[in-house]
């Protein structure tokens, strides 16, 4: 299932409800305001979160591809994953923009309960403090999965982001997310996902209001056609006073041992990504986006260099708008410290932005 609630404080007002925007079921094409899941651990970097979870990408890609090959050999089709995950593997290679200084302290109170404190200082936006809580239940499904999961984050202004994830049965998972802005209720979202042996179906309901007659309903479906090829689609229905509409998108994903190609085509435009695992240390990705509404296209190239022996993770990117960015994450053993540095340069606008982050625990 995709991410649905932002770990950062909500924007100054309720986000506008364009149809695809309320579906934060990822992260992103661009992440809609208020709909990205905060990481279960602490965050790194300044002004944003950068976790080492992406380090598992190479192994996951190889395991997924080898599993697909084995399924094909026995005549079975593999589960294709979720619709929101189609472009995620490529996007994880790109550095996340950082600005200012950020300090995060993580503290595990038990095997199931963790808290974290985050202080962010910025020269562009507002400086803030966040308190986060994560609870992971005792229903163990795999070495890396346990349910229910409760995640909450509150900032110094009293704005809250929270969500609950639970496995209701074999293949059936549900999630509920809410967001408040100080004393005002801003967003809420409920979704359910079912994973079959060779398909995944999901339904999301966002901000339903029976009295006003507004809300967003999103349906996703992804089906394995061959051990390597999966096809699916997305249907978004949105309604509010004086406006009603439907947006449909189709998606295709082709996976081999060391690369993955994905394309999404719909009324809003086209989104294509290519991920390639060059070696155990190097991964590269290319992303193409075309928007019919903005009448604009862009191409981005990103790569990730992982040096486990040096406890170093580097990400870099450049796009067709001449924006160059890079982040460096360095663990400092034997101390429980992680240092993050980031810089972005926009050549067209002559703007430079950098950030520094330190995570303890």
Swiss-Prot record:
It is a multi-pass membrane protein. GO terms for biological process: monoatomic ion transport; protein import into mitochondrial matrix; protein insertion into mitochondrial outer membrane; protein targeting to mitochondrion. The keyword Transferase does not apply. GO terms for molecular function: porin activity; protein transmembrane transporter activity. Residues 11-36 have a biased composition (Pro residues). GO terms for cellular component: cytosol; membrane; mitochondria-associated endoplasmic reticulum membrane contact site; mitochondrial inner membrane; mitochondrial outer membrane; mitochondrial outer membrane translocase complex; mitochondrion; pore complex. It is found in: Mitochondrion outer membrane. Residues 1-71 are annotated as: Disordered. Keywords: Ion transport, Membrane, Mitochondrion, Mitochondrion outer membrane, Porin, Protein transport, Transmembrane, Transmembrane beta strand, Transport. Residues 1-10, 37-52, 59-71 have a biased composition (Low complexity). InterPro entries: Porin_dom_sf, Porin_Euk/Tom40, Tom40. Channel-forming protein essential for import of protein precursors into mitochondria. Plays a role in the assembly of the mitochondrial membrane respiratory chain NADH dehydrogenase (Complex I) by forming a complex with BCAP31 and mediating the translocation of Complex I components from the cytosol to the mitochondria. Forms part of the preprotein translocase complex of the outer mitochondrial membrane (TOM complex) which consists of at least 7 different proteins (TOMM5, TOMM6, TOMM7, TOMM20, TOMM22, TOMM40 and TOMM70). Interacts with mitochondrial targeting sequences. Interacts with TIMM29; linking the TIM22 complex to the TOM complex. Forms a complex with BCAP31 (via C-terminus) which mediates the translocation of components of the mitochondrial membrane respiratory chain NADH dehydrogenase (Complex I) from the cytosol to the mitochondria. PANTHER family: MITOCHONDRIAL IMPORT RECEPTOR SUBUNIT TOM40. Belongs to the Tom40 family. This is Mitochondrial import receptor subunit TOM40 homolog.
């Amino acid at each position: 299932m995709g991410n649905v609630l932002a770990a950062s404080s909500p924007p100054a007002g309720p986000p506008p409800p364009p149809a695809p925007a309320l579906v934060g079921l990822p992260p992103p094409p661009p992440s809609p305001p208020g709909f990205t899941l905060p990481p279960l651990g602490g965050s790194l970097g300044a002004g944003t979160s950068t976790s080492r979870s992406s380090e598992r990408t190479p192994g996951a890609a190889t395991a997924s591809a080898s599993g697909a090959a084995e399924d094909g050999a026995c005549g079975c089709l593999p589960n294709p994953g979720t619709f929101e995950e189609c472009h995620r593997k490529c996007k994880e290679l790109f550095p996340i923009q950082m600005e200012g200084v950020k300090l995060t302290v993580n503290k595990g109170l038990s095997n199931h309960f963790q808290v974290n404190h985050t202080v962010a200082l910025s020269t562009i936006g507002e400086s803030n403090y966040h308190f986060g809580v994560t609870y992971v239940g005792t229903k163990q499904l795999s070495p890396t999965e346990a349910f229910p999961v409760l995640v909450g984050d509150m900032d110094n202004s009293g704005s809250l982001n929270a969500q609950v994830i639970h496995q209701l049965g074999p293949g059936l998972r549900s999630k509920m997310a809410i967001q408040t802005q100080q004393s005002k209720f801003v967003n809420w979202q409920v979704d359910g996902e079912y994973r079959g042996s060779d398909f995944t179906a999901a339904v999301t309901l966002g901000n339903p209001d029976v009295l006003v007659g507004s809300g967003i309903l999103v349906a996703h479906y992804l089906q394995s056609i061959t051990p390597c090829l999966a096809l699916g689609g997305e249907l978004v229905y949105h309604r509010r006073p004086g406006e009603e509409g439907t947006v449909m998108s189709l998606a295709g994903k082709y996976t081999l041992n060391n690369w993955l190609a994905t394309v999404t085509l719909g009324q809003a435009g086209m989104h294509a990504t290519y991920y390639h695992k060059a070696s155990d240390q190097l991964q590269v990705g290319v992303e193409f986006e075309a928007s019919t509404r903005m009448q604009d296209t862009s191409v981005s190239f990103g790569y990730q260099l992982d040096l486990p022996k040096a406890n170093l993770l580097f990400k870099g990117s450049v796009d067709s708008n001449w924006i160059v960015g890079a982040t460096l994450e360095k663990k400092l053993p034997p101390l429980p410290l992680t240092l993050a540095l980031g810089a972005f340069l926009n050549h067209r606008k002559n703007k430079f932005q950098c950030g520094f982050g330190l995570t303890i625990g």
